Amino acid sequence: MSRSVKKGPALCPKLMKKVEVASATNQKSIIKTWARWSTITPLMVGLNVGVHDGRRHVPIYITENMVGHKLGEFTTTRNFRGHAKAEKVSQVK
């Protein structure tokens, strides 16, 4: 289900202040954020945003195709290391 048009997009006010300052001054540094739930707006296009994945900030370059999506969609929070090999399982027994 999508968010109501009446409510508008979900945006973090602190993140939007940082984005406005960065776009006005043409900063190319990474904007760190923990707000994975924030929606990407057209104002963010061309900026580098560091989205927190629970351990570190993953740098993401925002493009036009990302507008309307959430920041958290572009970083994974879980690392799959693979299942145990058959050799290791037989040694444990």
Curated annotation (Swiss-Prot):
SUPFAM superfamilies: Ribosomal protein S19. Keywords: Ribonucleoprotein, Ribosomal protein, RNA-binding, rRNA-binding. InterPro entries: Ribosomal_uS19, Ribosomal_uS19_bac-type, Ribosomal_uS19_CS, Ribosomal_uS19_SF. GO terms for biological process: ribosomal small subunit assembly; translation. GO terms for cellular component: cytoplasm; small ribosomal subunit. Coiled coil: none annotated. Protein S19 forms a complex with S13 that binds strongly to the 16S ribosomal RNA. Belongs to the universal ribosomal protein uS19 family. This is Small ribosomal subunit protein uS19. It comes from Dehalococcoides mccartyi (strain ATCC BAA-2100 / JCM 16839 / KCTC 5957 / BAV1). The lineage of its organism: Bacteria, Bacillati, Chloroflexota, Dehalococcoidia, Dehalococcoidales.
